[in-house]
Structure formats: structure tokens, C-alpha cells
């Protein structure tokens, strides 16, 4: 007998998981496979398995965005005192933002965790290493060894051969003294694979929170899913969650919760905790430290076009090459990886990029500003020709004043305040110089003049640690203040690394899931 959403919301569950992305989907699968009854609640729609739409900022109405699995409302960001509203690359559907991600799953460096100069991790790299390996297996990660890594190389699946143009470019880099390798990617490359970088995958080919997490969890028979269920607030006593206030099918209802695992993303989870103000939690849930929402980090994108020395026929742009030559220079600077973007320097790609830049700029409110982007886009295509687009990911550092802010007048909106600190601007300048030196034998052109925050990589807004005064979560990502709340998205991270956070989110979710499975089984005996 098929159960309705109302039936499911009224049942008792071992855990309710809010969010179905890299963190929520992964931990839900672990718990379900260990025999625990799990309910996923997802703000967005279930969608159709055959969908292949990309996450476009050109869809403006909330209803149309929600239907496509996009976060429905614009983010309000005040950066260096200037406020703009724009649609960030955030998903709201089964799989969350990971349904649209480019499937890059790379490990950080040991020094990112063990000896970071400005952030303390309560666990070491060796504590995460087996969970990185398990996540790489779960997400079918393929790629090649990083020739610069002193660590034991991960056992990855073999990736398909490089496109001839990428293979030629890789040789050019090696001849220049660089150390390129095949980027680590969570794509199975099944027959008819389109890569689906930046778009939903209609096959179980691109492995994300949906395909590697939620769907296998549902297949166990121990998990269920309720979509279009927006959690408005957590409810409870001073030391425990007792339930959730949700909006489902246009009606507000209260559901009881034995245990809650929050995985709504670093922006969404912080917003929900801050929105859960009550007599028991005057500053929001799990916020006795006052740190919920603070220490927000992104990455800075340094996008540049690079012209191969030789024009080699190929299948077009691919996200296949990564380099770590600039990750951690000898002078101690903290930079990051350089990767191919998986996009060509074509009109559509450049127009999309320019429109994103304009939406975040002071020109955003000018009439027809989006149409004005067509002119420089057309000129750029003629100028760039056969160039390939690369991006350098520059590590961000957490500062308390960089934060998610709750607006009671717009309780569902994502609001951030962010200041680019002088040290970040200095590191950005040094990073750009390092890129110029590293690729000095190639013609290149930076595609942005102003610092560009990567709003798809937020993290750090509920960092974990051993001291309740300086962290929100304990070593196992349980809220210090509450006995039955865990947070397993990128909120937990004390530092942002120089790589995409997705693999670390999944590995940490596996770590926490294994701990909870053991603990809950012991409690039941």
C-alpha cells in the first residue's frame, strides 16, 4: 500500500534528514543500509529522472525556478558594504546543489587539516582518509594520480582517454615544468554519457546526492522521501529538538522528531538555525556560542582563457585537467588548485558568465543590463577563438563578521554579509602573479578584474570543534547545545581548502553516519 506524504510525516523515524545533497543523501544511505528508519524532507520537488536542465540564473520567477529544482529566491548579499540580489548556483530539489554540480571530487592537502595557520580541526587528515576512500568508492570517482602528492594515491577508477586537444595541452604543460593530472570526477561514463557538467544527469552516471545517496537509501526499504516540504523552524526545549514546523502542500504543520540531521547547505542550514528563535533559544537553535552563521567562507574564482600552442581537433571543452603546482607555495601562501572549467570560450558560455557578473555588480538594477552583455560576449568570442577556460580556486579564510544573517521580515531568504579582507586581496594578487608565471609559455587572458566569490562553495557557518565557546558542533558534528541535532553539510568546515568541498562533505557524512550507526545500535541494546 502506497503511503501518502501526510502518512510519512506523521510516523516515528530514527532520524529525519533535512536536505538531500552531498551530506544529507550520503548519511541517509549509510543509516538506511545499517537498518535505521530514515525520512528525507526536501524543500524542492522530486523532479523527473529524465531531466537534464542546467542551473540557469536567467529563470527569474520563483515558481519556475522551484519547478526546475533551483533555489527559488535570489540571495541578498552585502559585499564590502554594497548590496546586490542575484540567483546563486544553489539547488532545491532531490540531490540539492549536487544535482547540478560538475562532479569534481578531490581530496584536500594534509596541511589543510593538520597544520592550518588560521583554523583548528578537531580531527586529523588520517581520521578522514579512510572515509575519503569510501566516498571515492561510493561516488565511483575516476581520475589519475597527482604527481606532486606525498600521500598514498587513492584507488580511483580509470577515466576515459583524454580528448586529443586536452592530451596535447597536457603535454604542453608538462614540457613547461608543470604537473597536470586527470581531474578526479564522479562520473561513470556510461554509454551515451554527456558529462552533465552544471546540469542534471538523466542516467545513474553522474554520481551526486541523489544517485549515490537518496536513491540507494530508498532502495533499502528503510528510507522514505517527502518533497516540497519546507522546514520553517526547529522546535524543542533548551537541550533537545522535539519537532519541526514545516510548510507542505500550502499548509503549516508540526511533526515530531526523535533525531534531526541538518544538511541544507552552509547558507540554508545557518538560516534555519537562526530562524528557530524561541524562548528556549533566543538567538536561534544551537547558538549559545553566537557563532551560527559566522565564519562564512567561499572560494575566489580566478578565471582565465588559455590558448594551446597547437590547434588539435577534438570533441571540444572538457573538465579533465587539474594542477596543484600552485596549491601551497614555498613561501607559505595559501592558494589552491587550477582546473579546466569544462566550458569553451563560446558565445553562450561567455554570455552566461558576463550576466552572472553583472547581476552581482552595481549595474544590476539598470534596465536591460542583461541584454547589454551580448555585445562584449560577441566581441570576446572573436578575440578568444580556440581558447580553453581555466579557473584557479583561491582558499578563503573564515572571519566572524562574514556571516549568514536572518531577516525576520523575509524569513525564507538567504542573506549574507561579507567583507574581502586585505589579506585575501593580497593573496589574490599573488595568486594571479603565480598563474602568470606558471603559464608564461602560453598566451592567456584573465576574464575578471574584480574579485569573484564562488557562491556555489559556501562553508564554515556552523564549524565543529572541541570547545563549545568557539564552535557550534562537536567532533561528531552534534550540536554542543542539543542532544539530538547533527549538521553534516559544508557548515561544519573550519577551513575552506583550495579544492571543491564536495568530497569532504561526503567523507564527513560517512564518518558521522558510521559513528551514529554504532552509537544508536548500542543504545538500542
Residue ranges and their predicted role:
Residues 66, 77-78, 117-231, 463:
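Conserved redox-cofactor binding core of oxidoreductases
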Residues 494-516:
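A conserved FAD-binding loop/helix module that cradles the flavin
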Residues 33, 40, 44-54, 229, ...:
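Glycine-rich loop(s) and the adjacent beta-strand/alpha-helix scaffold that form part
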Residues 123-134, 426, 430-434, 511:
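A non-catalytic, amphipathic alpha-helix used as a structural packing/dimerization or gating element
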Residues 183-199, 232-237, 386-394, 412-496:
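A glycine-rich dinucleotide-binding beta-alpha-beta segment and adjacent secondary-structure elements
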Residues 50, 143-153, 446-451, 522-525:
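Short, glycine/acidic-rich hinge or "gate" loops at secondary-structure transitions
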Residues 75-88, 97, 101, 121, ...:
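FAD cofactor-binding and catalytic pocket of flavoenzymes
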Residues 2-126, 268, 285-308, 317-320, ...:
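N-terminal glycine-rich phosphate/pyrophosphate-binding loop and immediately adjacent elements
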Amino acid at each position: 500500500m502506497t503511503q501518502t506524504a501526510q502518512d510519512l510525516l506523521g510516523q516515528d523515524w530514527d532520524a529525519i534528514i533535512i536536505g538531500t545533497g552531498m551530506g544529507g543523501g550520503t548519511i541517509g544511505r549509510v543509516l538506511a543500509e545499517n537498518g535505521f528508519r530514515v525520512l528525507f524532507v526536501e524543500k524542492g520537488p522530486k523532479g523527473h529522472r529524465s531531466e537534464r536542465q542546467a542551473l540557469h540564473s536567467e529563470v527569474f520567477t520563483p515558481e519556475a525556478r522551484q519547478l526546475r529544482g533551483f533555489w527559488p529566491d535570489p540571495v541578498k548579499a552585502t559585499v564590502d558594504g554594497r548590496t546586490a540580489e542575484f540567483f546563486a548556483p544553489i539547488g532545491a530539489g532531490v540531490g540539492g546543489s549536487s544535482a547540478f554540480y560538475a562532479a569534481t571530487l578531490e581530496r584536500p592537502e594534509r596541511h589543510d587539516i593538520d597544520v592550518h595557520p588560521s583554523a583548528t580541526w578537531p580531527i586529523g587528515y588520517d581520521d578522514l582518509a579512510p572515509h575519503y576512500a569510501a566516498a571515492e568508492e561510493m561516488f565511483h570517482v575516476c581520475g589519475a594520480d597527482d604527481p606532486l602528492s606525498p600521500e598514498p594515491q587513492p584507488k580511483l577508477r580509470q577515466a576515459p582517454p583524454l580528448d586529443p586537444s586536452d592530451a596535447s595541452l597536457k603535454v604542453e604543460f608538462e614540457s613547461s615544468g608543470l604537473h597536470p593530472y586527470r581531474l578526479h570526477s564522479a562520473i561513470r561514463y556510461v554509454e551515451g554519457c554527456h558529462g552533465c557538467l552544471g546540469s542534471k544527469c538523466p542516467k545513474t552516471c553522474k554520481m551526486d546526492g541523489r544517485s549515490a545517496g537518496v536513491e540507494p537509501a530508498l532502495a533499502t526499504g528503510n528510507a522514505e522521501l517527502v518533497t516540497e516540504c519546507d522546514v520553517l523552524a526547529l522546535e524543542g526545549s533548551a537541550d533537545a529538538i522535539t519537532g519541526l514546523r514545516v510548510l507542505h502542500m500550502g499548509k503549516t504543520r508540526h511533526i515530531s522528531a526523535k533525531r534531526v540531521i541538518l544538511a541544507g547547505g552552509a547558507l540554508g542550514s545557518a538560516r534555519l538555525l537562526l530562524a528557530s528563535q524561541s524562548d528556549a533559544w533566543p538567538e536561534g537553535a544551537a547558538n549559545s556560542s553566537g557563532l551560527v552563521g559566522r565564519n562564512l567562507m567561499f572560494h575566489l574564482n580566478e578565471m582565465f582563457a588559455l590558448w594551446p600552442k597547437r590547434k588539435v581537433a577534438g570533441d571540444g571543452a572538457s573538465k579533465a585537467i587539474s594542477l596543484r603546482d600552485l596549491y601551497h607555495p614555498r613561501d607559505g601562501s595559501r592558494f589552491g588548485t587550477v582546473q579546466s572549467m569544462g566550458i569553451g570560450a563560446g558565445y553562450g558560455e561567455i554570455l552566461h558568465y558576463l550576466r552572472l557578473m553583472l547581476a552581482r555588480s552595481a549595474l544590476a538594477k539598470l534596465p536591460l543590463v542583461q541584454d547589454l552583455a551580448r555585445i562584449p560576449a560577441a566581441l570576446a568570442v572573436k578575440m578568444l577563438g580556440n581558447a580553453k577556460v581555466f579557473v584557479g580556486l583561491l582558499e578563503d579564510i573564515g572571519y566572524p563578521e562574514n556571516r549568514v544573517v536572518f531577516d525576520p521580515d523575509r524569513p525564507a531568504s538567504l542573506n549574507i554579509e561579507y567583507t574581502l579582507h586585505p589579506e585575501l586581496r593580497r593573496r589574490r594578487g599573488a595568486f594571479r602573479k603565480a598563474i602568470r608565471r606558471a603559464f608564461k609559455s602560453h598566451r592567456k587572458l584573465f576574464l575578471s578584474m574584480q574579485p569573484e566569490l564562488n557562491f556555489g562553495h559556501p562553508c564554515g557557518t556552523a564549524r565543529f570543534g572541541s570547545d563549545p565557546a568557539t564552535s557550534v558542533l562537536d567532533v561528531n558534528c552534534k550540536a554542543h547545545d542539543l542532544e539530538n541535532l547533527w549538521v553534516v553539510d559544508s557548515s561544519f568546515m573550519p577551513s575552506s581548502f583550495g579544492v571543491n568541498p564536495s568530497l569532504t562533505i561526503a567523507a564527513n557524512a560517512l564518518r558521522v553516519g558510521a559513528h551514529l550507526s554504532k552509537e544508536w545500535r548500542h543504545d538500542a541494546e
